[in-house]
């Protein structure tokens, strides 16, 4: 169950949003402090499962063949690419960039990771979308299911960064549960935990920011 303070902040953000003809996303602005972000080890780069989901489709692509590819399709992967497609994507950078923008998470059988790094690393790497490796005998269905409820939060070298954590069609309680899950992970990840968090705000796409903590 979400904290009361988080639920109230979400309610305020939703109530103060301007009326639009489209469903707005709900975003989180995270401000850190007392961290040297020039050191890669201090940067935030986390995949976080949202207990309430994102409220919209999270797309997953899988590089696999044979039974793994079949299971990936059954599990709801949005794209399943055979290994020979890696070379084709690497040779067609506009297509690769479009795919990287559209897909939230990539998965690849471990045997194909070196080729993906060589052919697609310059496209996927900077976007934080290098595939999660799938070892032999691993359950691709479980991984896809998990990623379909996850988001990636990345600070890069900045103390302030943003993440989409829901949509306005979700209940305040659902959005608040997602926020609290992110805060909990941040407090675990950061060297000094809560002391490294300066402030966190929630807002809709076009609405004003409301302080969560």
Swiss-Prot record:
It holds the Pfam family Ribosomal_L1. GO terms for molecular function: rRNA binding; structural constituent of ribosome; tRNA binding. One of its GO terms (biological process) is regulation of translation. InterPro entries: Ribosomal_uL1 (IPR002143), Ribosomal_uL1-like (IPR023674), Ribosomal_uL1/biogenesis (IPR028364), Ribosomal_uL1_3-a/b-sand (IPR016095), Ribosomal_uL1_arc (IPR023669), Ribosomal_uL1_CS (IPR023673). CDD domains: Ribosomal_L1. Belongs to the universal ribosomal protein uL1 family. NCBIfam families: PRK04203.1. Part of the 50S ribosomal subunit. This is Large ribosomal subunit protein uL1. The lineage of its organism: Archaea, Methanobacteriati, Methanobacteriota, Stenosarchaea group, Methanomicrobia. The gene is rpl1.
